[in-house]
Amino acid sequence: MSQPRIGQKVVVDVPATTANLGPGFDCLGAALDLNNRFAMRRIEGSGERFELIIEGTYGSHLRGGPDNLVYRAAQRVWKAANMEPVALEARVRLAVPPARGLGSSATAIVAGLMGANALVGEPLSKEKLLELAIDIEGHPDNVVPSLLGGLCMTAKAASQRWRVVRCEWISSVKAVVAIPSIRLSTSEARRAMPKAIPVSDAVVNLGALTLLLQGLRTGNGDLIADGMHDRLHEPYRWRLIKGGDDVKAAALEAGAWGCAISGAGPSIIALCAEDKGQAVSRAMVKAWEAAGVASRAPVLNLQTSGSHWQPADAG
């Protein structure tokens, strides 16, 4: 383990994620085949220096400096590895839009951790990176699938150790993700929720989550339809999304089995059979257009490999 040389660079690819999928609030998340790419390079200067260069449509919403999540995550690696921090530049090709409920912040955290760790010879294990990622983000449902890939259920055990279960998602189930031009911060979406819920609502969610996971494992659309319901967060969040109810109704009318807010929103995810994907996509975009909101709705697959890095000269 040694300090990276000036100019040393790694490239980290990190997938978007969708969290909750209805009943899996703050514990269930899935990686999608839409990636942000981070090229991280050591530059001259003190460890407090961090430069951010954004490529892509959404760059105007992000800033560099010490509060940037890539920088903060990298600092956690230096500290955990007992190393002096170094100056970094991060050049980001942004395909995952921020403040849309698709884990953009998780991509920054995972990239900062994985990239900084790679630059110094990977002294930290993937398990340690996972622990740091959850600590920085504050909840596991985006950072875990972003790092590991696939459909992940994460819970803190009685031992206070984070436990991750990789769940099955059959390839015949497709995700249509309607991404609007409007933004919604996670903090605003969390403020909309009550501080306490009835036990009956928690019981309904437990049952729904069981049905959803079995539906995703088997491709049973009826189970997905019955399982993709929530009483913990969605009843309080739909009203924050302009036209959201109409987009959901349009997706179901076009043949989707189920529909949910992606993460904190405002993006909306619909699950359907492969032959329904394009029809569901068109219906969701049209419904948002009627509400005066521009959007796009790609049909996406589960991304199973998670985040990975390579030396810059390898690609």
UniProtKB/Swiss-Prot annotation:
<dbReference type="GO" id="GO:0005524">
    <property type="term" value="F:ATP binding"/>
</dbReference>
<protein>
    <recommendedName>
        <fullName>Homoserine kinase</fullName>
        <ecNumber>2.7.1.39</ecNumber>
    </recommendedName>
</protein>
<comment type="function">
    <text>Catalyzes the ATP-dependent phosphorylation of L-homoserine to L-homoserine phosphate.</text>
</comment>
<dbReference type="InterPro" id="IPR014721">
    <property type="entry name" value="Ribsml_uS5_D2-typ_fold_subgr"/>
</dbReference>
<feature type="binding site">
    <location>
        <begin position="97"/>
        <end position="107"/>
    </location>
    <ligand>
        <name>ATP</name>
    </ligand>
</feature>
<keyword id="KW-0067">ATP-binding</keyword>
<dbReference type="InterPro" id="IPR013750">
    <property type="entry name" value="GHMP_kinase_C_dom"/>
</dbReference>
<keyword id="KW-0808">Transferase</keyword>
<dbReference type="InterPro" id="IPR006203">
    <property type="entry name" value="GHMP_knse_ATP-bd_CS"/>
</dbReference>
<keyword id="KW-0963">Cytoplasm</keyword>
<keyword id="KW-0418">Kinase</keyword>
<keyword id="KW-0791">Threonine biosynthesis</keyword>
<dbReference type="Pfam" id="PF08544">
    <property type="entry name" value="GHMP_kinases_C"/>
</dbReference>
<dbReference type="GO" id="GO:0005737">
    <property type="term" value="C:cytoplasm"/>
</dbReference>
<dbReference type="InterPro" id="IPR006204">
    <property type="entry name" value="GHMP_kinase_N_dom"/>
</dbReference>
<keyword id="KW-0028">Amino-acid biosynthesis</keyword>
<comment type="similarity">
    <text>Belongs to the GHMP kinase family. Homoserine kinase subfamily.</text>
</comment>
<dbReference type="InterPro" id="IPR020568">
    <property type="entry name" value="Ribosomal_Su5_D2-typ_SF"/>
</dbReference>
<keyword id="KW-0547">Nucleotide-binding</keyword>
<dbReference type="Pfam" id="PF00288">
    <property type="entry name" value="GHMP_kinases_N"/>
</dbReference>
<dbReference type="InterPro" id="IPR000870">
    <property type="entry name" value="Homoserine_kinase"/>
</dbReference>
<dbReference type="InterPro" id="IPR036554">
    <property type="entry name" value="GHMP_kinase_C_sf"/>
</dbReference>
<dbReference type="GO" id="GO:0004413">
    <property type="term" value="F:homoserine kinase activity"/>
</dbReference>
<dbReference type="GO" id="GO:0009088">
    <property type="term" value="P:threonine biosynthetic process"/>
</dbReference>
<comment type="pathway">
    <text>Amino-acid biosynthesis; L-threonine biosynthesis; L-threonine from L-aspartate: step 4/5.</text>
</comment>
